[in-house]
UniProtKB/Swiss-Prot annotation:
GO BP annotations listed: aromatic amino acid transport; thyroid hormone generation; thyroid hormone transport; thyroid-stimulating hormone secretion
One Pfam match: MFS_1
Tissue specificity as recorded in UniProt: Highly expressed in small intestine, particularly in jejunum and ileum, scarcely in colon and substantially in kidney, liver and skeletal muscle. In the brain expression is low and appears to be restricted to a subset of neurons, microglia cells, and oligodendrocytes.
Protein name according to UniProt: Monocarboxylate transporter 10
Loss of function: phenotype: Deficient mice grow and reproduce normally, show no gross phenotype and no obvious neurological defect. Deficient mice, however, display increased plasma, muscle and kidney aromatic amino acids (AAA) concentration under both normal and high protein diet, although this concentration remains normal in the liver, but it does not alter thyroid hormones homeostasis.
Organism: Mus musculus (Mouse)
Gene transcribed to yield this protein: Slc16a10
TM segment ranges: 64-84, 112-132, 142-162, 169-189, 202-222, 233-253, 292-312, 327-347, 363-383, 385-405, 417-437, 449-469
Amino acid sequence: MVPSQEEPAAERETNEAQPPGPAPSDDAPLPGPGPSDVSDVAAEKVEVELTRSAGSEPPVPPEGGWGWLVMLAAMWCNGSVFGIQNAYGVLFVSMLDTFKAKDDDNMAFKTAWVGSLSMGMIFFCCPIVSVFTDMFGCRRTAVVGAAVGFIGLMSSSFVSSIEPLYLTYGIIFACGCSFAYQPSLVILGHYFKKRLGLVNGIVTAGSSVFTILLPLLLGNLISSVKLFNTLRILCIFMFVLFLAGFTYRPLVPSTKEKESGGSRSSFFSRRKLSPPKKVFNFALFKETTYAVWAAGIPLALFGYFVPYVHLMNHVKERFQDVNNKEVLFMCIGITSGVGRLLFGRIADYLPGVKKVYLQVLSFFFIGLMSMMIPLCSAFGALIAVCLAMGLFDGCFISIMAPIAFELVGPQDASQAIGFLLGFMSIPMTVGPPIAGLLHDKLGTYDVAFYLAGIPPFVGGVVLCLIPWIHSKKQRKISKNAGGEKMEKMLENQSSLLSGSSGIFKKDSASII
């Protein structure tokens, strides 16, 4: 066996200098190890080295190469999933015209639940998706999710009433989108580290681009080929998403690959399920910084989506003579894409958890812009508010995944993002209906928009605690490490003193 590089040179020379001879007798045993002991020690060294190389340390992100193709695939995923969801307003009008019954006065309420259920299910399923991502990897999870989404969207084009859409569009299609979307956030952290903020900005900008273009495309398709054929055409987006999922080549082994010793198997191989205690990694919440982050983000989102849902109706009531009300959402989509690229790049220059300050800044401005909506007496002022709101919306979204990687690391980022998105589904579902209820009671949206600006401020204040908690933890670790180092130095010094004292006594005795 080739000797280890860490083995002292003097020891090697001593072993080489000993000539072979007869086996020692029992009366004079050699102090050194025998041949069997040497082989055991060598085997232990090899085992330790193999254990270290078996995946205990995550691989270094390549910062490019195949990762650029992964980035484009993730960009298509974000664009197709949230572009379709954000353009539901166009489908909403077509569904009303297609399924409307003369004796049904609640048709708008029923139709609205289709889109609301779909958006909520995407985020609600994310904690479950994170488990599948850890168990089977990003590639398998994303591909299967896109296939399920394709089936749900295609089956939605064959219904004859609004109720089956709750299952086909609101649950099956949304769950498939969730399984395809969440791995697209996780896989980027495996391929990028230094450029992760910029890459996430580019990927999340895909939803802005699709949000700008899809409403125009859907409007033309519905007017020419009607609703059902439009849904079938949208299935093309899901099929491309299915193909894009195959680009998520894994760098970090999944849980199943670790349990099987890292051996590769077929794509749809049968695997033994993990125990429940290993499925959901609740130990993440023992990390105080992540627990605060997972509480602060949903708290800020109680008012986050109120302008996106009720802005059109507010403009209709406040500015009756304005025809192009859709330009407000186009402004939000354009500046949101700019914000994702801009702040994603800025995040690359902020070390560690200081990236959280960008989210704090974005929530403060989003809350302020929400409160300014009722104060706008001119449509031009409202356009300016929407431009600013979209810019900081892009800031908040683009750095979500980089912060998760900073707080828990790449190995646990999947479930960290999944838990967060699951928590986000609650305020996203509850906030807009509360604003609608206030409008029904008061006859105006003014109070609703004022109140919608409060939760982003509160959530931003909570997020400010994260850098403080992190720095306090680092100081404690440094202090403990310094104490251990001092104790070790004192032990070494005392051992040297005791050794020198023994030598002095031995020499004195021999002289006497």
